[in-house]
From Swiss-Prot:
SUPFAM superfamilies: Aquaporin-like. A motif (NPA 1) lies at residues 70-72. It is a multi-pass membrane protein. This is Glycerol uptake facilitator protein. The chain crosses the membrane at residues 8-36, 42-62, 87-110, 146-171, 181-197, 235-259. Residues 37-41, 111-145, 198-201, 220-234 are extracellular. InterPro entries: Aquaporin-like, MIP, MIP/Aquaporin, MIP_CS. Belongs to the MIP/aquaporin (TC 1.A.8) family. Residues 66-69, 70-80, 202-205, 206-219 dip into the membrane without crossing it. Keywords: Cell membrane, Membrane, Transmembrane, Transmembrane helix, Transport.
Length: 262
């Protein structure tokens, strides 16, 4: 690999780092502000902020890196021979590093508010009570959750998501003539999924969106609870937002290629 190729890959990875991180920065910040200040966003507004983050990030990254912004999509594109294998690991590391770093930035910005909330409600990091605060950064089990149910649901939504995304990205799609329309529609799809499903189940669709913040939480006091979410050591909760989207998006992608693509 020559110098120019390395420089190009480095630039692409940097854009994946920034793009994925920006989604996290906007989305998690809205949750933190709504929870810890007097400025409250409702569920619809928070969903719109997440969708807007996706829209902005795709517009920002697409011309340079292709705007994967998601390890599951990177893996699918590689397995379907649409992406250079030399870029797979750098892209995935960039995406997860981006969410980790921007979670760190959020923590620095809102550290005083987080500490005040912990003091006010006698919250000790690493205890189950502390999951109320940790859930601002990544997803944790809802009351009476079922591991198998949530895992399968994440897969199913991933299948639907990638099929719609691939259909929107077809070369002969009418929207391809208007560069901002496709990112807007994908952002709108994210808004719809958030609106109708996140209050019922923790749908992430993106391993990096959850794993980066989860790793960060494990380093600042939540420890292994950041990964397990409860007492289930055999099936730790982080497997749902980390592994299920990869399975779902790859299944959906191949369904599209084999049965839908013209």
């Amino acid at each position: 690999m020559n110098f120019c190729s390395k420089k190009k890959i480095l630039k692409q990875c940097f854009f994946e780092f920034l793009g994925t991180g920006l989604i996290i920065f906007l989305g998690i910040s809205s949750l933190v502000v709504s929870k810890l200040t007097n400025f409250h966003f409702n569920h619809c507004e928070i969903s719109c902020i997440w969708g807007l983050g996706v829209f902005i990030s795709i517009c920002f990254c697409s011309s340079v890196s292709g705007a994967h912004l998601n390890p599951a999509i990177t893996i699918f594109l590689f397995l379907s021979s649409q992406f250079n294998k030399k870029k797979v690991i750098p892209y995935i590391l960039s995406q997860i590093s981006g969410t980790f770093f921007f979670t760190f930035l959020i923590y620095l910005i809102f550290n005083n508010l987080l500490n005040s909330f912990e003091s006010k409600y006698n919250i000790v990091r690493g205890t189950k009570k502390s999951l109320e605060l940790a859930s601002l950064f990544c997803v944790f089990p809802k009351e009476n959750y079922n591991f198998i149910h949530d895992f399968i649901l994440e897969i199913l939504i991933g299948i639907i998501f990638i099929i719609i995304l691939m259909k929107l990205s077809e070369k002969n799609n009418l929207f391809k003539f208007y560069k901002f329309i496709n990112p807007f529609l994908i952002g709108t799809l994210v808004i719809i999924i958030n609106l109708f499903l996140t209050s019922y189940s923790n749908i992430t669709l993106n391993p990096a969106r959850d794993l980066g913040p989860r790793i960060f939480l494990s380093l600042i006091g939540w420890g292994k609870l950041a990964f397990t979410g409860d007492d289930n050591i055999i099936f730790p909760y982080f497997l749902i937002p980390t592994i299920a989207p990869i399975i779902g998006i790859n299944l959906g992608g191949w369904i599209y290629i084999l049965y839908i693509k013209k």
